[in-house]
Amino acid sequence: MGEQTLRGLFLGFIKIHILYHAAKEPIYGQEFSKELKRHGYEISFGTLYPILHKLEENGLLKKITKNVNGKIRKYYTITKKGNEVLQEAKMRAKELVDELFED
């Protein structure tokens, strides 16, 4: 299976992963890109930032702008709505994964 096809299948899980980490602590794009690489996902900033913006637009993340060593950095934290969606997504993902590996 091609890398593009596989990446397309995992985009939903990447969004859940973003919400999961944003629930633990504020995240920002560059650092989160490293987190995804740890799990074997090579995702460009041209893909990652639109995902972050869409999650913010949908009310699942909130952006906080901070000045870090003279640089403006945009951090994202989960919202109440985002946390509710995360809990539901985790439950559904677990159900699917359990089914995939039940044999």
Q: Each predicted region: which residue ranges?
A:
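Short, intrinsically disordered or compositionally biased N-terminal tails of bacterial proteins
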Residues: 1-5
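Amphipathic alpha-helical dimerization/coiled-coil segments
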Residues: 87-103
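Beta-hairpin "wing" of winged helix-turn-helix
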Residues: 58-72, 77
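A cross-family signal for key residues in well-ordered alpha-helices
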Residues: 17-20, 53, 87
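Basic, amphipathic "hinge/linker" alpha-helix immediately C-terminal to the N-terminal HTH DNA-binding motif
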Residues: 72-90
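N-terminal helix-turn-helix DNA-binding core of bacterial DNA-binding proteins
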Residues: 6-47
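Basic amphipathic alpha-helical segments that dock to polyanions
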Residues: 48-50, 54-55
